[in-house]
């Protein structure tokens, strides 16, 4: 009797596929918009910085490295205050992140999306 957990087969997400299958701004995906966080707001203190020098952005489980040795997770946008997103963007609250891989290989994006879903994003 084998009690070991077998790794789940990761199916890449399709282009423009969402998990859950609803748009980013809907209640089912991200909850209510709570308002933009600025550097001077109290909520700014709740954001968690990441200073790990070995990765472009934190990947504690090394899922990207395990999937593609030598490749790092690359965050292109996280919390933001520049005003370049739509008015109620979750980037302004620190609840949205745009990711890619360090080698910028677009063929990896479907699997990268699935890894993000499996990690709870």
From Swiss-Prot:
GO terms for cellular component: extracellular space; plasma membrane. Ca(2+) 1 binds at residues 60-61, 76-77. One of its GO terms (molecular function) is patched binding. InterPro entries: Hedgehog (IPR001657), Hedgehog_sig/DD-Pept_Zn-bd_sf (IPR009045), Hedgehog_Signaling (IPR050387), Hedgehog_signalling_dom (IPR000320). It comes from the Eukaryota. Gene3D superfamilies: 3.30.1380.10. GO terms for biological process: animal organ development; cell development; cell fate specification; cell-cell signaling; central nervous system development; neuron differentiation; proteolysis; regulation of gene expression. Keywords: Autocatalytic cleavage, Calcium, Cell membrane, Developmental protein, Hydrolase, Lipoprotein, Membrane, Metal-binding, Palmitate, Protease, Secreted, Zinc. Pfam families: HH_signal (PF01085). Ca(2+) 2 binds at residues 61, 77, 80, 82. It is found in: Secreted; Cell membrane. SUPFAM superfamilies: Hedgehog/DD-peptidase. The C-terminal domain displays an autoproteolysis activity and a cholesterol transferase activity. Both activities result in the cleavage of the full-length protein and covalent attachment of a cholesterol moiety to the C-terminal of the newly generated N-terminal fragment (N-product). The N-product is the active species in both local and long-range signaling, whereas the C-product has no signaling activity. Cholesterylation is required for N-product targeting to lipid rafts and multimerization. Zn(2+) binds at residues 91, 98. Belongs to the hedgehog family. N-product is active as a multimer. The sonic hedgehog protein N-product binds calcium and zinc ions; this stabilizes the protein fold and is essential for protein-protein interactions mediated by this domain. Intercellular signal essential for a variety of patterning events during development. Signal produced by the notochord that induces somite patterning, dorso-ventral patterning of the brain and early patterning of the developing eyes. Displays floor plate-inducing activity. Binds to the patched (PTC) receptor, which functions in association with smoothened (SMO), to activate the transcription of target genes. In the absence of SHH, PTC represses the constitutive signaling activity of SMO. This is Sonic hedgehog protein. The gene is shh.
């Amino acid at each position: 009797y084998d009690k070991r957990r077998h790794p789940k087969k990761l199916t890449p997400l399709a282009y423009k596929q969402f998990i859950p299958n609803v748009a980013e701004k809907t209640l089912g995906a991200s909850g209510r918009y709570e308002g933009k966080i600025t550097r001077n707001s109290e909520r700014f203190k709740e954001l968690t910085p990441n200073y790990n020098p070995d990765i472009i952005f934190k990947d504690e489980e090394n899922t990207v490295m395990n999937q593609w040795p030598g490749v790092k997770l690359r965050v292109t946008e996280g919390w933001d205050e520049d005003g370049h997103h739509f008015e109620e963007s979750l980037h302004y609250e620190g609840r949205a992140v745009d990711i890619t891989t360090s080698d910028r290989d677009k063929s990896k994006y479907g699997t990268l999306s699935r890894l993000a879903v499996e990690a709870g994003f």
